Amino acid sequence: MQIPKYENKPFKPPRRVGSNKYTQLKPTATAVTTAPISKAKVTVNLKRSISAGPTLNLAKKPNNLSSNENTRYFTIMYRKPTTKKHKTWSGDGYATLKASSDKLCFYNEAGKFFGSSMLPSDSDSLFETLFKAGSNEVQLDYELKENAEIRSAKEALSQNMGNPNPPTTSTTETVPSTKNDGGKYQMPLSQLFSLNTVKRFKSVTKQTNEHMTTVPKTSQNSKAKKYYPVFDVNKIDNPIVMNKNAAAEVDVIVDPLLGKFLRPHQREGVKFMYDCLMGLARPTIENPDIDCTTKSLVLENDSDISGCLLADDMGLGKTLMSITLIWTLIRQTPFASKVSCSQSGIPLTGLCKKILVVCPVTLIGNWKREFGKWLNLSRIGVLTLSSRNSPDMDKMAVRNFLKVQRIYQVLIIGYEKLLSVSEELEKNKHLIDMLVCDEGHRLKNGASKILNTLKSLDIRRKLLLTGTPIQNDLNEFFTIIDFINPGILGSFASFKRRFIIPITRARDTANRYNEELLEKGEERSKEMIEITKRFILRRTNAILEKYLPPKTDIILFCKPYSQQILAFKDILQGARLDFGQLTFSSSLGLITLLKKVCNSPGLVGSDPYYKSHIKDTQSQDSYSRSLNSGKLRVLMTLLEGIRKGTKEKVVVVSNYTQTLDIIENLMNMAGMSHCRLDGSIPAKQRDSIVTSFNRNPAIFGFLLSAKSGGVGLNLVGASRLILFDNDWNPSVDLQAMSRIHRDGQKKPCFIYRLVTTGCIDEKILQRQLMKNSLSQKFLGDSEMRNKESSNDDLFNKEDLKDLFSVHTDTKSNTHDLICSCDGLGEEIEYPETNQQQNTVELRKRSTTTWTSALDLQKKMNEAATNDDAKKSQYIRQCLVHYKHIDPARQDELFDEVITDSFTDLKDSITFAFVKPGEICLREQ
């Protein structure tokens, strides 16, 4: 083998691609001459002799693209791996595939290679495959076919071909080869290989790992730094500015995105809730009619308060107020120095990062829709747990919600589901900043597992929403209050000793004339009101009258059928009641049975109390198979009149599913289209049923179980509602009647209440008119409050005995108690009486002097008369503005449907109370 001859030639610097010019050698200032340089002329060899022979075959880089026409070019999209639900691409680029290779090479838009991946086994899925290239995910977009596109791709990729790995240092000068005639190289090596290192650019700002520039946390800088609120109050029309304490650094201003939609009572509500959750004392407002929501007051701290009870009536917008408060606390904080801020001093995060909303499962969808309606779910992350999830999936979702930031801020969960994920919440309870409990009266039972689970989370800021905070007694009231603000009422033993016992004694009818007990009870009541009004806000739906269409309330007294009267007599005779030992609890089964008779005698045979206590009677078959009743006749006549006389929809409400079954069969026989919602309907189907009824004009009626759906159930597609039977708890009926008269309603509303004349229906109605006294006393409903009657328990055993009496000779027992008018449709004005003065006189005479038996009997008769007068007075107050109408004397009931159907109903309606809306009054 012939070996090429070695020639010792001077070093020749490399030539730049595309350049034929060489720069002359310019010695550097630091060069050291160690030998004299020949004076011979320095020449440059333009021809570099390369010996023939074998050469080193270097491996080609992926950047060195072949010019082979068999190479295929693609456009690509790439991104970093992410777990987000809605993924986006971060960049575009190119991919190449050589015919002789099964490897795709990926480049970014600048032509820089960043990875490669093997082809998938299935060539048909080439464009659906997600490739892994380095730290990126890559997907092919389309293949380049046009010559212009391929040429453009080649140009982009060729930019980095010459220098795929650019060095960090560069040589500033090169030395051409020099030689003299002696052939001896005389350039010093130190000068030949001298390099100038390029210095890296130094940033003038300090390096940080944070994504945003934050304000230094040093105390010295904090004092010098000025902070500013998120919103400029000068650029907002009618802003809502929150109150603050002396330590606040910036104002908290409600986002105008929400603030512009809030009504005056909602603005006040948001500010009240904010004060409570921030632990601020209540301000002293001299004139409550002046709007103070546009000003920020500096208040003292109240260490006893960190929670709030919003007890507004249904329909006042408790959900919207809560969402406004949540959004405000997520975005803003008055303590700017404790969070990251922008360079201009604006807080970048709020006081709360994670908020837990607990509600009935039927309201989860409604809460999420409300967040989407008012904020748009792109602004705030709201997580709900799917009903299809397994328990493990729910637990994982809760863990991710608490630990992963910036994705979800609000978790909405049902009360029952809370128990299954309680362990995950307990482990990370320090991450939950706020708790919202909708329908908070569910937490009234101190032994409830749900209540104890929420207590174990130890969340400081709590907000409870309810329209019925006090339903039975002060024991339940204490449970709710102690959960909101622990310890504010002391221990239960001390609360019972100081408040429950004296207040209960004062309300006991046996102590109605004991001046000492009554005064002590009143004193304790006022003391408790002063404590609770610091964090309880209660408004009635009377303030909605100027925002909603007019509403006409009609109470119709329906004449019972002969079969019903017979059933009442047989049941009461068969029950063999001992009124001496009778209590409300022991007689509850009998009361329920009598209520069913009012609805339809056909419900008697299947009643458990009837089967176990009432034996077979001679006339059982004559009424147990009858479906007729006075209320059913009035109901079907009303439905037919609404369907024919108007284009409106109607909601029919009952407390019993068996009653709904009878009504549903009658509507089917009459060809009335309808839908139904009761406790048997799965929660996930309820929203679709309600939406279908509200939007589908072909659906005429909606059958509703009174206790189904929660307060968030809106049936504004209907403008007429018929309450077929009453519940002992007035809040249940009020909630049911508010389904149609709320935000979103465009038509005048008509509410019909059907009552069986002279029977237990009327007694329940009368009790409802008085049972609100406890809530009115402690929650501030002062408009309809009678201070004297609210101090007494207005029902005793005589009243309970009266429940089981049937008055067949009256047109309305309720009207007989309160009025002696002729029922000509006039509105009766009631003068103030000296009832309170008479009561005080009886108290003094019964406690300060010795009494003989004759005088005692006389006083007892006076007391009974006084009690009846008090009941009448209170019922009259509840029926203020109602017109008294006797159909035998007056055929105008301020409703065209009843008026047009009056010929058919004249023998079925014995009396009516009507409270007309504004439109009805104008028409008259």
Curated annotation (Swiss-Prot):
Molecular function terms from GO: ATP binding; ATP hydrolysis activity; DNA binding; DNA topoisomerase activity; DNA translocase activity; helicase activity
Residue spans of biased composition, Low complexity class: 168-178
Alphabetized InterPro entries for the sequence: Helicase_ATP-bd, Helicase_C-like, P-loop_NTPase, SNF2-like_sf, SNF2/RAD54-like_C, SNF2_N, SNF2_RAD54_helicase_repair
Single GO cellular component term: nucleus
A GO BP entry: double-strand break repair via homologous recombination
Residue ranges, annotated region (Disordered): 1-21, 155-182
Assembly description: Interacts with RAD51 and DMC1.
Organism lineage string: Eukaryota, Fungi, Dikarya, Ascomycota, Saccharomycotina
Short sequence motif named DEGH box, residue ranges: 472-475
Biased composition (Basic and acidic residues): 1-10
Binding positions for ATP per the UniProt entry: I346, P347, L348, T349, G350, L351, C352, K353
Signal peptide bounds: none
Protein name in the entry: DNA repair and recombination protein RDH54
Main localization category: nucleus
Record EC number: 5.99.1.-, 3.6.4.12
Role played: Involved in the recombinational repair of double-strand breaks (DSB) in DNA during mitosis and meiosis. Has DNA dependent ATPase activity. Promotes D-loop (displacement loop) formation with RAD51 recombinase. Modifies the topology of double-stranded DNA during the D-loop reaction to facilitate the invasion of the homologous duplex molecule by the initiating single-stranded DNA substrate. Required for adaptation from G2/M checkpoint arrest induced by a double strand break, by participating in monitoring the extent of single-stranded DNA produced by resection of DNA ends.
Family stated for the protein in its record: Belongs to the SNF2/RAD54 helicase family.
Catalytic activity: ATP + H2O = ADP + phosphate + H(+)
UniProt crosslink position (Glycyl lysine isopeptide (Lys-Gly) (interchain with G-Cter in ubiquitin)): K615
Originating organism: Saccharomyces cerevisiae (strain AWRI1631)
Record domain Helicase ATP-binding: where: 299-487
Subcellular compartments: Nucleus
Cited CDD domains: DEXHc_RAD54, SF2_C_SNF
